[in-house]
C-alpha cells in the first residue's frame, strides 16, 4: 500500500472526513502534517499542491487534492488502484 500524507489543520471537519474515508478504504496509517503548527509545513504544502486550504492529500507521490477530490476518486473507483498499484 502506498504511503498517505495529509496536510491538516485544527478544527477541520473535511480533514476528519478524509481520515475516515481513508481508514474505511483500508489505510492503517496516515502521515499527518499540521500546517497550523509550522509555517514551514504550510509553505511546503503550498509548494507541493499549489493550494492554501486543508486537507491536502497525497497518495505516494500523487497529489489527490482535498476531501471532495478524494471522495470523487473513491466514488469513481480509482482510490483502490491508487492506494494499491
UniProtKB/Swiss-Prot annotation:
Disulfide bonds join 12-15. PROSITE patterns: GLUTAREDOXIN_1, GLUTAREDOXIN_2. The keyword Transport applies. GO terms for molecular function: protein-disulfide reductase activity. The keyword Transport applies. GO terms for biological process: cell redox homeostasis. Residues 1-85 form the Glutaredoxin domain. GO terms for cellular component: cytoplasm. Belongs to the glutaredoxin family. This is Glutaredoxin. It comes from Neisseria meningitidis serogroup A / serotype 4A (strain DSM 15465 / Z2491). The lineage of its organism: Bacteria, Pseudomonadati, Pseudomonadota, Betaproteobacteria, Neisseriales.
Amino acid at each position: 500500500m502506498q504511503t498517505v500524507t495529509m496536510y491538516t489543520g485544527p478544527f477541520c471537519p473535511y480533514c476528519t472526513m478524509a481520515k475516515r474515508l481513508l481508514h474505511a478504504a483500508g489505510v492503517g496509517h496516515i502521515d499527518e502534517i499540521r500546517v497550523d503548527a509550522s509555517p514551514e509545513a504550510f509553505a511546503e504544502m503550498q509548494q507541493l499542491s499549489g493550494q492554501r486550504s486543508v486537507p491536502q492529500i497525497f497518495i505516494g507521490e500523487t497529489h489527490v487534492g482535498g476531501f471532495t477530490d478524494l471522495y470523487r476518486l473513491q466514488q469513481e473507483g480509482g482510490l483502490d488502484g491508487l492506494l494499491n498499484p
